[in-house]
Amino acid sequence: MAVNPQGVAAVLADLKGRDFLSCADFTAEQTVALLELSRQLKSGDRRIDLGNRVLGLIFTKASTRTRVSFQVAMARLGGQTVDLNPQVTQLGRGEPLEDTARVLSRFCDVMAVRTFAQQELLDYAHWASIPVLNALTDLEHPCQAMADFLTIQEALGSLTGQTLAYVGDGNNVSHSLMLCGALLGVNVRIGCPQGFEPLPEVIDQARNLAVADARIEVMTDPVDAVRGAQALYTDVWASMGQEQEQSQREEAFRGFCLNEDLLAHADPNAIVLHCLPAHRGEEISSGVMEGEASRIFDQAENRLHVQQALLAAVLGGL
């Protein structure tokens, strides 16, 4: 599926004022158009001025790339960012979420929330009268997935029919990769140990969203998962909040390290992705991370360009 570069604004017009809580919130055509707008912003073919709009960040989880990329994205669009750390606001003293969301809607033009429970994000979206963006929850990481597929598109030239193999924990990142990949016509394979699979309801949702006969598969053999794949992806084995499970997970994921041996089973021209931060020597070897196949730091940069496009779309800046 392709969108005429001149037709991007028309396709994205319906996103003005919308929330982005899940990759499934937008249509396949809108997802493709957001990637095209991201490309235009990155290349300098398109410039957008949001006229001093304000983004409010509510992050209850630690963040480097998401926080900085949102701040820089808003600055490059001519806007400002207010960092609403719960530790230094009344949120940390028990102010009800619904009150905070309504008050911030009077001060800000858009809100990005990074938290543990998806329900908390949904509650912000319910009570806020401004667009709410998912900056990560335990269920999904949609901005990351958009940046991932922009990176794959840049490296491979197209998305439809490509195969992305994710090896590791069936976590929030795997959920968003399945949903976004399905909308873009990408075959997504999840390779994980038994008991660490993505949620069945998300797998079913992705399969129902799939276009261009994209296949969503889950398998327990990492070699089968990566065999012939054009893009390989991994993430930490223990996400934030799971640190107490680290030793158990290290044992369970033995054999799932994205190293040179595993990479050898992929397409000879395969690229390697990781959403960072990485634990070298655990889920990915240092050699693969620094090798010729790695597009990991291009991938990190693309968070900026995707989030610029997203902010411009939901704020009607096109």
UniProtKB/Swiss-Prot annotation:
It catalyses: carbamoyl phosphate + L-ornithine = L-citrulline + phosphate + H(+). One of its GO terms (biological process) is L-arginine biosynthetic process. It is an enzyme of class 2 (transferase). Disulfide bonds: none annotated. It comes from the Bacteria. Carbamoyl phosphate binds at residues 63-66, 90, 114, 141-144, 275-276, 303. One of its GO terms (cellular component) is cytoplasm. Reversibly catalyzes the transfer of the carbamoyl group from carbamoyl phosphate (CP) to the N(epsilon) atom of ornithine (ORN) to produce L-citrulline. Belongs to the aspartate/ornithine carbamoyltransferase superfamily. OTCase family. This is Ornithine carbamoyltransferase. It comes from Prochlorococcus marinus (strain MIT 9313).
